[in-house]
Amino acid sequence: MAKIVRIKGEIIGKDEPMVFTKEYNVVKEDDALETMYSEMGSKHAVKRANIKVVEISEISEEDIQNPILKKTLEMY
């Protein structure tokens, strides 16, 4: 059964820390972490060691902030 996971964190090592929030529809929290590390490392050219995860939480469909994820879930 899939669940929606919200990851809050920051990228350190740049001029200023960059705060981010990402939401994923995954089976395991580990899958969400791996996807987040891959996306953030690719987009911002940072190593995994420079990405600090502050919070990982499972959320309900009503709490989704990402409009693309929300529309995708509405289709099913």
From Swiss-Prot:
Gene that specifies this protein: rpl18a
A Pfam family that the UniProt record links to this protein: Ribosomal_L18A
Keywords from the UniProt entry: Ribonucleoprotein, Ribosomal protein, RNA-binding, rRNA-binding
Keyword 4Fe-4S appears in the UniProt entry: no
One GO MF term attached to the UniProt entry: large ribosomal subunit rRNA binding
Complexes and interactors: Part of the 50S ribosomal subunit. Binds 23S rRNA.
Gene Ontology CC terms: ribonucleoprotein complex; ribosome
Transmembrane segments: none
GO BP: any one term: translation
Name listed for the protein in its UniProt record: Large ribosomal subunit protein eL20
InterPro entries from the UniProt entry: Ribosomal_eL20 (IPR028877), Ribosomal_eL20_dom (IPR023573)
Protein family membership: Belongs to the eukaryotic ribosomal protein eL20 family.
The organism of origin for this protein: Methanococcus maripaludis (strain C5 / ATCC BAA-1333)
